[in-house]
């Protein structure tokens, strides 16, 4: 696609698909510069069409693995463990489009199992952040009946851009400046309880083996007694720390109260999500389900 919109927010055009965009620099017209850009775009397309795919490799089981910055250690531990077991791993960054791509590929039958480490997109959909993957996130694997291990990774935060993008109704909440362009808001007790209910409603639809694996010592790198100092929206010290065990407990309690135990297993571990042993347990459990154990 050759478009002057290629230099801006292209989510509406690209979405979750592998679309290549060329920015023509000038508006669409024929001149020396745009002719060269159009020519480059055509050559790129021709090259992709002529590519000799050769012999296809023997198909391995495709495992979808979700990741987000604050739970990246968990994903980095899990990925090689899955590969050692002979699986091919597709990694999805849960920034909205990543979760959309995951759900769509599962529905197309291209994914055999899901290790859903980062479910932060559900938080943004429920609470009102900017990285939502839509209302159907975390449902396709259950509907398709494929094995899934679901972890409440990064559900302790709601994603916004710069501080001025945070709605005024939340100006007195607890925040953390992840980068100059990413502002995180801590989920409170009420929101966490609502998330527990939503998780249960989604996972109760599962037609295949499903496990909720809960790291009781924290859902993200920030969700820990050793986590960073929280701030207010103006950048000063927050009224309370980011680590909020009562909020995490509210999520777990609501989840257990609403979960259909006849369809979904629930397992709590006295570990932090980013401990290597937690990733090992998640991989072991998914491997067992794939192999019918």
Residue ranges of predicted features:
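Active-site gating loops and adjacent loop-to-helix segments of metal-dependent hydrolytic enzymes
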Residues: 169-178
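Short loop/turn segments immediately following the C-termini of beta-strands
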Residues: 153
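Metallocofactor- and cofactor-centric catalytic cores in central/energy metabolism, strongly enriched
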Residues: 1-143, 148-150, 160, 184-293
């Amino acid at each position: 696609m050759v478009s002057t919109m290629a230099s801006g927010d292209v989510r509406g055009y690209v979405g979750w698909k592998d679309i290549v965009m060329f920015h023509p620099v000038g508006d669409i017209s024929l001149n020396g510069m745009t002719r060269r850009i159009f020519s480059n775009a055509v050559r790129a397309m021709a090259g992709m069409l002529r590519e000799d795919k050769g012999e296809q490799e023997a198909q391995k089981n495709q495992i979808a693995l979700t990741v987000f910055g604050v739970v990246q250690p968990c994903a980095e531990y899990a990925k090689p463990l899955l590969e050692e077991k002979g699986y091919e791993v597709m990694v999805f960054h849960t920034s909205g489009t990543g979760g959309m791509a995951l759900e769509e590929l599962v529905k197309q039958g291209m994914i055999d199992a899901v290790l859903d480490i980062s479910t932060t997109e559900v938080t943004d959909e429920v609470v009102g952040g900017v990285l939502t993957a839509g209302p159907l996130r975390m449902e396709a694997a259950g509907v398709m009946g494929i094995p899934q291990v679901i972890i409440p990774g990064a559900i302790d935060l709601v994603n916004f851009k710069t501080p001025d993008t945070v709605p005024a109704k939340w100006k007195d909440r607890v925040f953390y400046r992840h980068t100059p362009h990413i502002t995180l808001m801590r989920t409170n007790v009420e929101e966490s309880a609502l998330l527990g209910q939503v998780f249960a409603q989604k996972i109760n639809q599962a037609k295949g083996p499903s496990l909720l694996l809960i790291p009781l010592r924290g859902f993200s790198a920030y969700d820990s007694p050793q986590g960073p100092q929280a701030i207010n929206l103006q950048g000063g010290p927050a009224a309370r720390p980011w680590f909020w065990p009562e909020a995490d407990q509210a999520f777990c309690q609501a989840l257990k109260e609403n979960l259909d135990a006849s369809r979904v297993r629930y397992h709590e571990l006295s570990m932090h999500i980013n401990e290597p042993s937690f990733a090992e347990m998640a991989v072991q459990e998914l491997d067992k389900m794939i192999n019918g154990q």
